[in-house]
Structures are given as C-alpha cells and as structure tokens.
Amino acid sequence: MAPSFIFVEDRPAPLDATSDPPSLFDGTTRLYTSYVCPFAQRVWITRNFKGLQEKIKLVPLDLGNRPAWYKEKVYPENKVPALEHNGKIIGESLDLIKYLDNTFEGPSLYPEDHAKREFGDELLKYTDTFVKTMYVSLKGDPSKETAPVLDYLENALYKFDDGPFFLGQLSLVDIAYIPFIERFQTVLNELFKCDITAERPKLSAWIEEINKSDGYAQTKMDPKEIVEVFKKKFM
C-alpha cells in the first residue's frame, strides 16, 4: 500500500539548454524526468508511493529545449526517464519502476501472491499494446478503435475482488497505466466527445480511487495543458 502520510513537494523548474548540469555522479540519486512525459510520470509516481521524495531528487528537463550535457554526460539515449544511482544510469520506465520497488525501502508495490504476480506480469506486457492503440486511434475513430483495449482493462479489473485496483491493492500495474489513462481520458473527451468510462464501471471506479492517492495527484498535468500538448504533437 502507498504511504499514509502526505509529503508536499514543490516542483523544481525544468532545466533547458541554458542550464548548468547538477554535480553529476556525486552520490546523489537523481530522477531525470519531464512533467509532460507519461513514461517519466510512471517513475515519479513510484518514487512518491515508495516515500522516496527525500532520497531521490527530481531533475526535470525541458524536452523541447533540452540541455546538451544530458546526452553527452548523463544518458546517451537522450530520453526520459533516467535514474542516476550508485554511479550508473538506468533507463526505460517499466524497468525503472521495478528497480525502484526492488532496490529501495518503502512499501512493496508488487504482491507476493503467485497468481497476482502472474497476472500483473501479463498486464505490464500489455501496456505496449494499450499505449500504441490509444495513440494510433487519434488519427481515426477513437471511440471505435480504443474500445478493445479499454474493454481489456475493464475486464481485468474483475479478476481480483479484494480492492479496486488491478491486483486488488495498488501496485506497479496501476502506476504503469494511470499516466496514459489520465491523458487519454481528457483528450478523447475534450476533442472527440468520447467518454472512456462509459459502460465501464470498474474502470470508472479505478480512476476515481487512484485519484484519491496523493502520491499520484501531485504528478498530474493540468487538463488544458494535456489537450494543448496532444494538439501540437499528435494531431
């Protein structure tokens, strides 16, 4: 379960091409992120739910004007998220949320139960299909094209009855999906008049429940900004 305390954190200003780098590889654990990137948001949420706000420093980047030193000295892939820890850099959001859960102290975000772990692994693998389908739908008929993957999530939420989340209690699976649900719920409703929760009561309840979590709520984007970002990048 997520920590019960509320840690209020000010968001640092994003670093851009004019910004000096931090003191790299000085023993500080840093999460290089972007406030608009759903993949990076996964790791940010995990950090918060583990209660690691004071142990992992946020280093947000301006992806539209990113500093050259990031690619040259930190992460040659030049993407976010990336974690600077113990003198090395680790990337890829799904790998990172597992790494944070397995490496750092704090509440476990993946169950011990074999059946739940097996289903959780299946759902984590499905994120690629889900994300690709949702983005591709923006060029066609989202109401029709997103239905199969949204129905998949709706049905998955019936699997366990010991809580409102995919594996009953909140886990890495919920964290992997919520940044994308957050964005597409807003974009499809605002631009296509498509309600992704219509006739999907479990998905609706899941969204309502996870929005109560402070560790997630502090990472959310402004809905107006979501729409503007999608208009600019994908439409």
Curated annotation (Swiss-Prot):
| Highest taxon above the source species | Eukaryota
Under InterPro entries, the record lists: Glutathione-S-Trfase_C_sf, Glutathione_S-Trfase, Glutathione_S-Trfase_N, GSTL1/2/3, Thioredoxin-like_sf
| This protein's record includes keyword Transferase | yes
Q: Which UniProt keywords apply?
A: Cytoplasm, Detoxification, Transferase
E.C. code: 2.5.1.18
Asked if the record carries the keyword S-adenosyl-L-methionine, the reply is no
What residues does glutathione bind to?
C37, P38, N65, R66, K79, V80, E92, S93
Entry's PROSITE patterns?
GST_CTER (PS50405), GST_NTER (PS50404)
Domain GST C-terminal: residue ranges: 86-230
Catalytic function, reaction form: RX + glutathione = an S-substituted glutathione + a halide anion + H(+)
Molecular function, one GO term: glutathione transferase activity
Q: Name one GO biological process term.
A: response to toxic substance
Give the UniProt entry's GO cellular component terms. Answer: cytosol; plasma membrane
Where in this chain does the record put each GST N-terminal domain?
27-108
Q: Which top EC class applies here?
A: transferase
* Localization annotation: Cytoplasm, Cytosol
Alphabetical list of PANTHER family matching this protein: GLUTATHIONE S-TRANSFERASE L1, GLUTATHIONE S-TRANSFERASE L1-RELATED
Family note: Belongs to the GST superfamily. Lambda family.
Role of this protein? Catalyzes the glutathione-dependent reduction of S-glutathionylquercetin to quercetin.
User: How is this protein named in the record?
Assistant: Glutathione S-transferase L3
Species, as recorded: Arabidopsis thaliana (Mouse-ear cress)
